[in-house]
Amino acid sequence: MIVVTGGAGFIGSNIVKALNAQGRTDILVVDNLKNGKKFINIADCDIADYLDKEDFQSRIFAEEGLPDIDCVFHEGACSATTEWDGKYMMDNNYEYSKDLLNYCLNRKIPFLYASSAAVYGDGPTFIEERQYEKPLNVYGYSKFQFDQYVRRILPLAESQVAGFRYFNVYGPREQHKGDMASVAFKLHNQVLAGEKLKLFGAYDGYEAGMQTRDFVFIEDVVNVNLWFMENPEQSGIFNLGPAAAEPFKHIADAVIDFHGQGEIEYIPFPDRLKGAYQSFTQADNTRLRDAGYDKPFHTVSEGVQKYLRWLSDNPRVLDFTKK
């Protein structure tokens, strides 16, 4: 059995779908469907079982009631960078992750988990080393603390433990994320609504629309996760991004190019994000390449075109957008 926590979420559901494409249906999805609209992400997937997150946790504590597990993809987390309830964040992203990791270590189950580029704060260097890690928000801190916990354990681990610092992921099955959905998704919806495409104006030394991120298409994220499952001798903490940062304006340009229409409107940078916003990110993926992963990453133009084609072919998912 393969366990995917957060399996009805953005990255988790894409992993489930990719496992199905490999012929795997012996999948246990763990999630919290309080936001019931997330179900659409796994409606076209084949799984063996579903467990609520709290039920799954109780079975971990009891050390019973779970099947034999081949691998765990731990994608379940509170991923809202604007959430400032530190207790909630640490309970979900740190304590829960520790419990699951130790369950896996005790049974020598490969454990692949979601970290985040948010651990680096405002950079400007994005290398998997302590001196570059300065999170700007409690979400980034929760991910950083778990990475630190993993670092202490890795030398003694007798089974695979691999964490992936996701940079700016976009792609299918993210419509439930509301404000945390990607810029590509938001701009697509603005075009459909006949609105101008809104980007932040000048801020932090960057011209309007030129704040820059290492955008990574969901297919690439899934490919890396599955590669590590197939290479269980590889452990560590790895940046997961193309190492090719592009400005937000390139996203807008790709959306306009796909639709054949649209106009950019620059809006004032919001006060609530000042001091807690990454204006530039770019993965150094040397460790990922050194581990042996050699597939190319999608460019923004390539990824956005694929994504918007998927949205156009699956218009029903917009009915499940979180308001």
UniProtKB/Swiss-Prot annotation:
It catalyses: ADP-D-glycero-beta-D-manno-heptose = ADP-L-glycero-beta-D-manno-heptose. Keywords: Carbohydrate metabolism, Isomerase, NADP. Pathway: Nucleotide-sugar biosynthesis; ADP-L-glycero-beta-D-manno-heptose biosynthesis; ADP-L-glycero-beta-D-manno-heptose from D-glycero-beta-D-manno-heptose 7-phosphate: step 4/4. The keyword RNA-binding does not apply. It comes from the Bacteria. Its EC number is 5.1.3.20. The active site is at Y139 (proton acceptor), K177 (proton acceptor). One of its GO terms (molecular function) is NADP binding. Its cofactor is NADP(+). One of its GO terms (biological process) is ADP-L-glycero-beta-D-manno-heptose biosynthetic process. Binds 1 NADP(+) per subunit. PANTHER family: ADP-L-GLYCERO-D-MANNO-HEPTOSE-6-EPIMERASE (PTHR43103:SF3), NUCLEOSIDE-DIPHOSPHATE-SUGAR EPIMERASE (PTHR43103). Catalyzes the interconversion between ADP-D-glycero-beta-D-manno-heptose and ADP-L-glycero-beta-D-manno-heptose via an epimerization at carbon 6 of the heptose. Belongs to the NAD(P)-dependent epimerase/dehydratase family. HldD subfamily. Contains a large N-terminal NADP-binding domain, and a smaller C-terminal substrate-binding domain. Homopentamer. This is ADP-L-glycero-D-manno-heptose-6-epimerase. It comes from Hydrogenovibrio crunogenus (strain DSM 25203 / XCL-2). The lineage of its organism: Bacteria, Pseudomonadati, Pseudomonadota, Gammaproteobacteria, Thiotrichales. The gene is hldD.
